[in-house]
């Protein structure tokens, strides 16, 4: 394998002028081993990118830049849940459509999030009361330090609110994600934007979530942006009850019993939208 010089201006959400001198597409573990050998010989670090929808690209990448082309879907319909392995290069919303068409449930609240499947576990993407970690069984990775493939279980991924082990470990390249999905429609509708709706199937939920998102955040293809990248602040119920001004804000119950406040609404009220 040989690198190519590549212009990346149209490969990031902000459409920033950017280029890489050493760029590789990869589709297999063997590809990654060859790329790693090249990087070591050139004394270069390795930087992985996805669709660039949640990143600020530099004008010039001096290190080796890689991107997955693994668009594979592997389905195993056994047991109470359906196991689905998805390649890192699959566009997230294409996965949502795949699940709707196959009658696989659980990810509907996460519809409309830009990016790829490989990026989803990194910050444990979430929206409208749901997180991807609730459906992850394992993540297949390539370890740049050992030059070997490794499988991390859900617990080994150390998922938290918008965080995971992948934010701490630069040596792990996500190759594919193993999901465990529901066989019946059990929507989470406790978020204010959804609680007044009634849905008969996942397709209706997905369409509604996409419509809500489109009203709030423009498509990066139409207006360059990084989407919703901030965290909603979380406080205890006791703190929430003590401050009556907080009751004027949108709030949601967290799974651990705390109260989550809407950072987006706070920014709107401060005139920082």
Features from the language model and the residues they span:
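Anion-binding (especially nucleotide phosphate/pyrophosphate-binding) glycine-rich loop
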Residues: 1-135, 143-145
């Amino acid at each position: 394998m040989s690198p190519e010089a590549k212009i990346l201006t149209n490969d990031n959400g902000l459409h920033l002028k950017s280029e890489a001198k050493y760029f590789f597409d990869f589709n297999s573990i063997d590809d990654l081993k060859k790329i790693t050998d090249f990087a070591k010989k050139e004394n270069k670090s390795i930087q992985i990118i996805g669709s660039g929808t949640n990143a600020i690209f530099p004008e010039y990448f001096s290190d080796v830049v890689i991107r997955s082309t693994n668009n594979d879907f592997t389905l195993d319909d056994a047991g109470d849940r359906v196991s689905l392995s998805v390649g890192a290069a699959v566009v997230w919303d294409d996965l949502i459509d795949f699940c709707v068409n196959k009658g696989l449930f659980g990810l509907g609240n996460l519809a409309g999030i830009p990016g790829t499947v490989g990026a989803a576990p990194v910050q444990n993407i979430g929206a409208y009361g749901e997180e991807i970690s609730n459906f992850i069984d394992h993540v297949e990775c390539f370890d740049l330090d050992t030059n070997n493939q490794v499988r991390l279980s859900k617990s080994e991924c150390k998922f938290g609110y918008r965080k995971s082990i992948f934010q701490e470990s630069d040596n792990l390249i996500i190759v594919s994600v193993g999901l465990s999905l529901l066989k019946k429609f059990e929507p989470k509708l406790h978020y204010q934007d959804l609680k007044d709706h009634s849905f008969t199937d996942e397709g209706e939920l997905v369409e509604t979530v996409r419509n809500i998102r489109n009203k709030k955040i423009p498509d990066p293809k139409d207006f360059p942006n990084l989407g919703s990248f901030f965290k909603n602040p979380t406080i205890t119920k006791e703190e929430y009850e003590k401050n009556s001004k907080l009751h004027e804000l949108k709030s949601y119950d967290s799974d651990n019993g705390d109260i989550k406040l809407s950072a987006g609404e706070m920014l709107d009220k401060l005139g920082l939208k």
